[in-house]
Amino acid sequence: MAAWEFQSLQNIAKQNGWHQFISMQDYYSLLYRENEREMIPYCQSTGVGIIPFSPLARGLLTRPYGSQQTTRQKADIYSEFLLGETTSADIEIIGRVEELARQKGVSMATIAVAWCVAKGVIPILGLGSIDRVNQTVEGLARTKTGLLAEDDIKFLEQKYIAKPVTVVI
């Protein structure tokens, strides 16, 4: 959804005396950052909470590229629609997540979640096991103690190349 569309919905709600939206769910990860152009600044300026889904890019940011397909990738045809083709820039970013995770002694998922939190959003995570819950808690706790420095964030973001906007309904 474009920011102007979301604003239109807010206007309709206000004009009719309805409750306005207090949060926005949209796709956002190190591999898809198009919402940084309009939606995230709009939400931040109007006090709307941002709770993006798929911050681990359907599992791509949880393991070295090509090491194995996730269960979700094998069974979820929506995943292909959402992610599109994996680009060389995506592969480089995944490699950087892997490198930083190794340096800091944490999982790749922890790095990806910490990046989201550092960007001022609180992501929705699909946690299918106790290990995933523990990794997430660790990531959030370590984020508060400075897991990612500003240079780390720049390192993770540096290779990103803009993509066509994905419309999610």
Model-identified regions with their sequence ranges:
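Structural preference for beta-strand elements that scaffold enzyme active sites
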Residues: H19-Q25, G49-I51, I122-I124
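Short helix-capping segments at alpha-helix termini
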Residues: K14-Q20, G105, T145-L148
